[in-house]
A protein has these predicted regions:
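Flexible, solvent-exposed coil segments and beta strand-coil junctions
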Residues: 19-20, 36, 113-122, 175-185, ...
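Residue-level detector of the transmembrane beta-barrel scaffold of outer-membrane proteins
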Residues: 10, 38, 70-74, 151-153, ...
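Short strand-turn segments of transmembrane beta-barrel domains in outer membranes
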Residues: 67-144
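N-terminal periplasmic accessory domains that precede
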Residues: 1, 10, 24-30, 40-41, ...
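Short acidic/polar hinge/loop motifs at secondary-structure boundaries
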Residues: 14-43, 89-93
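Structural signature of outer-membrane beta-barrel domains
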Residues: 4, 16, 78-82, 159-163, ...
């Protein structure tokens, strides 16, 4: 019953960190389905898991290479009905003129930032009747060598997705000396978001009598650029004729990356004696160097 931000994700029993500072889980769609053997969902911790409080655990078990050469490809194209069906405009900015690093990162803590250090691309907005179609594609190759003892699986995927949404927020107050509540602030927000994700995955397994070694590697890179248009109306007293209307545009660029490598071994030393071990390195990063707000008050 806990919120999804308390869940975390495992690959072959090993936790993968999230680049998002508000969520512990990572999206499952960044993993190619061609590499997945099964999906194990746990709502409570078991004895073989680390003692980490969680709302739920999703473990993706990657399959071994096929017994013979295999190549698979998939592609899909679509569109967001928020723009295509409902006819809303898609907002973009000048993507080639974003600030890649903050002045602090680029020049150090002693540097005094100047206006020229910040690019103008985020405020160069354009409105389109509809975005480009969404595209999702993947390719996987697998084979076995050395009398089927050594297996190799390679996979890559690309997701180019345009999406949009809208939300309404309001704040209420109680008028002095009255029992009536009134809306003091009403905000309507429109979002236009472009997500570009690319991933590469590799798994090598070596099977010997009584022994098995598995080495899994993954790298996923996501670039997200979003425009939020916020229209708000503010008033201080119910029935008052005076009010202010604000139009605010927020433009941001976020880059996330995940790298993980996992070497795992299982050794059956006797009929009732088995040893398993794993060596893991993982790293998740998020960069949000350019976040721009422009507000017009009427």
């Amino acid at each position: 019953g806990m919120d999804k931000r308390y869940n975390y994700t495992l690959v072959n029993g090993v936790k993968i960190p999230s680049p998002d500072d508000k969520n512990r889980y990572i999206p499952l769609n960044i993993f190619p389905s061609d590499l997945m053997d099964r999906l194990v969902v746990s709502k409570s911790l078991t004895a073989d898991m680390e003692g980490d409080a969680a709302g739920g655990v999703v473990d993706m078990v990657m399959k071994d290479a096929p017994s013979r050469f295999q190549i698979q490809a998939n592609a899909a194209i679509g569109a967001s009905d928020y723009f295509w069906k409902d006819g809303r405009d898609y907002l973009t900015s000048n993507r080639s003129d974003y600030t890649k690093k903050s002045p602090y990162e680029a020049f150090g803590s002693e540097y005094k930032a100047q206006m020229s250090d910040f690019k103008n691309g985020p405020v160069q907005l354009k409105s389109h009747s509809m975005p480009s179609p969404n595209f999702i594609g993947g390719l996987s190759i697998g084979n076995r060598f050395w009398n089927d003892r050594l297996g190799v699986m390679l996979a890559g995927s690309v997701q180019n997705v345009f999406r949009g949404t809208e939300r309404t927020y309001n704040s209420v107050k109680m008028a002095s000396g009255e029992q009536a509540m009134y809306i003091s602030n009403l905000q309507h927000r429109y979002y236009s978001i472009h997500d570009l994700t690319a991933g590469a995955h590799a798994k090598i397994d070596l099977t010997l009598p009584g022994h098995k070694l598995e080495w899994y590697n993954m790298y996923v890179h996501t670039n997200s650029k979003g425009i939020r248009y916020n229209n708000s109306v503010n008033t201080e007293y119910i029935g008052a004729d005076s009010y202010t209307q604000d139009d605010e545009v927020r433009s941001l660029s976020t880059t996330q990356s995940i790298f993980a490598t996992n070497l795992k071994g299982t050794h059956h030393l006797a009929k009732d004696f088995t040893i398993d071990w794993s060596g893991v390195f993982s790293q998740a990063k998020e960069e949000d160097p350019d976040r721009t707000y422009v507000t017009l008050t009427n």
